[in-house]
């Protein structure tokens, strides 16, 4: 009877130890960040059940991953170059935010600095799997490449600034030339106006641009015609007129007149 009692006690103690180990293991898994993520995923899934179809598409579904404690023992702290890279990225992001035209910059800067400080403190104590850090081993090289790219960008910006300065100088010189040409045009316009006024005074041109010529005298209107003056010099005027009429109506005279007319026509046509 005593042997059976001892064996039953041993079995009960063994069962208690197994139950306790299982409970401790479950507590560790529940306290681990992966299980926290899983619990969040469960809460997200339960919350997504109450959302509409459009809102459910926007929800991020987190996948629960179980990692044994043996694997977590091989994890290593985050490398320093990775921390430096993350710090530089956060600094550039903060500068990009503060460069914008926003209100309460000092409060925002203080808040962002505190977030950066807390984040870097978490990174200092963070342990990650060594296999996952293969892509982070070349952070120094990446930083070097980025710095070289930054230098190249600065040089290109400097060259662009020089070109812009040259263009500004040429535009300024062109503006000066245009202004000088405008002054010359104004001077020439004034000179032309003065010359026009002088011409009006010389030629007596009125506002209607009509040339004010002097009036003819009455003597010039009553003066005899040149033909009459010539005829007065000839004693036998009637006989001369008859002879001229005979010559004009004769065949040789008509031929001569036709010849002269044809010659004029050819000259006008040429």
Curated annotation (Swiss-Prot):
It comes from the Eukaryota. Its main location: nucleus. The modification Phosphoserine is found at residue 52. Keywords: Centromere, Chromosome, Coiled coil, Nucleus, Phosphoprotein. It holds the Pfam family CENP-Q. One of its GO terms (cellular component) is nucleus. Phosphorylation at Ser-52 is essential for CENPE recruitment to kinetochores and orderly chromosome congression. Residues 1-59 are annotated as: Disordered. Residues 143-205 form a coiled coil. One of its GO terms (biological process) is positive regulation of protein localization to kinetochore. Residues 7-20, 39-48 have a biased composition (Basic residues). It is found in: Nucleus; Chromosome, Centromere. Component of the CENPA-CAD (nucleosome distal) complex, a complex recruited to centromeres which is involved in assembly of kinetochore proteins, mitotic progression and chromosome segregation. May be involved in incorporation of newly synthesized CENPA into centromeres via its interaction with the CENPA-NAC complex. Plays an important role in chromosome congression and in the recruitment of CENP-O complex (which comprises CENPO, CENPP, CENPQ and CENPU), CENPE and PLK1 to the kinetochores. Belongs to the CENP-Q/OKP1 family. Component of the CENPA-CAD complex, composed of CENPI, CENPK, CENPL, CENPO, CENPP, CENPQ, CENPR and CENPS. The CENPA-CAD complex interacts with the CENPA-NAC complex, at least composed of CENPA, CENPC, CENPH, CENPM, CENPN, CENPT and CENPU. This is Centromere protein Q. It comes from Rattus norvegicus. The gene is Cenpq.
């Amino acid at each position: 009877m005593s042997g059976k009692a001892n064996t039953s006690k041993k079995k009960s103690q063994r069962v208690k130890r197994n139950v306790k180990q299982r409970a401790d293991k479950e507590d560790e898994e529940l306290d681990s960040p992966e299980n926290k993520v899983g619990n969040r995923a469960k809460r997200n899934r339960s919350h997504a059940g109450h959302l509409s179809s459009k809102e459910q598409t926007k929800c991020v579904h987190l996948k629960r991953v179980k990692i044994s404690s043996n694997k977590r023992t091989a994890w290593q702290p985050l490398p320093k170059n990775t921390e430096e890279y993350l710090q530089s990225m956060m600094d550039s992001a903060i500068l990009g935010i503060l460069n914008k035209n926003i209100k309460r910059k000092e409060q925002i800067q203080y808040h962002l600095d505190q977030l950066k400080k807390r984040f870097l403190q978490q990174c200092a104590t963070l342990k990650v799997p060594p296999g996952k850090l293969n892509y982070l081993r070349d952070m120094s090289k990446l930083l070097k490449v980025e710095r070289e790219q930054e230098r190249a960008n600065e040089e290109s910006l400097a060259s662009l600034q020089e070109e812009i300065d040259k263009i500004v100088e040429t535009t300024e010189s062109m503006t000066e030339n245009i202004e000088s040409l405008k002054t010359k045009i104004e001077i020439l316009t004034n000179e032309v106006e003065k010359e026009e006024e002088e011409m009006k005074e010389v030629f007596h041109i009125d506002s209607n641009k009509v040339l004010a010529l002097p009036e003819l005298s009455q003597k010039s209107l009553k003066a005899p015609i040149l033909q009459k003056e010539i005829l007065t010099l000839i004693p036998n005027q009637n006989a001369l007129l008859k002879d001229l009429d005979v010559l004009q109506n004769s065949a040789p005279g008509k031929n001569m007149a036709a010849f002269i007319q044809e010659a004029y026509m050819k000259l006008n046509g040429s």
